[in-house]
Amino acid sequence: MAENKDEQLTDEELAQLQLAEENENAVDRLVQELGCPTRRIRQFAARVLHLLAERDPQRVVPCAPALIEALDRPEAQTRWEALDALAALATTCPERLGDAFEGAETALFDESSSTLRYAAFRLLCVWGA
């Protein structure tokens, strides 16, 4: 299954994901980039953290506060990637996600992005299961 998912990744995503799997400093850099003033960098960091959370949720558990904070970013993609990463953590550490509720609820009613609404719905379903 992971091979099929890897085929859908860009070369840059795959390279950063592999680096994050091997190097804790790379994960720390991605967390810092979630707060970057550049939208594209925030989106990319959230995407890689989402992919890493699906592969190895334990490596992303310490990033939960930064992912929750990313739910306040203006662009939908950063928020849906953060929601998807948090959904991957919901079965591992649901107790660390309490502060995500408000951001997920806000995203659930965001009329501008169906992808964002769906990501919020998935998080709330997995978290509540």
Where are these regions (language model features)?
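Structural signature of alpha-helical solenoid repeat scaffolds
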Residues: 50-51, 87, 125-126
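N-terminal "cap/leader" segments of large eukaryotic alpha-helical scaffolds
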Residues: 1-33
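A contiguous pocket-lining binding segment that forms or flanks enzyme active sites
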Residues: 102-129
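Alpha-helix N-cap/helix-start positions at coil->helix boundaries
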Residues: 7-8, 24, 39-40, 76-77, ...
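Alpha-solenoid HEAT/ARM repeat scaffold
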Residues: 10-14, 28, 43-46, 79-83, ...
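Amphipathic alpha-helical scaffolding segments comprising HEAT/armadillo-like alpha-solenoid repeats
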Residues: 21-33, 57-70, 94-108
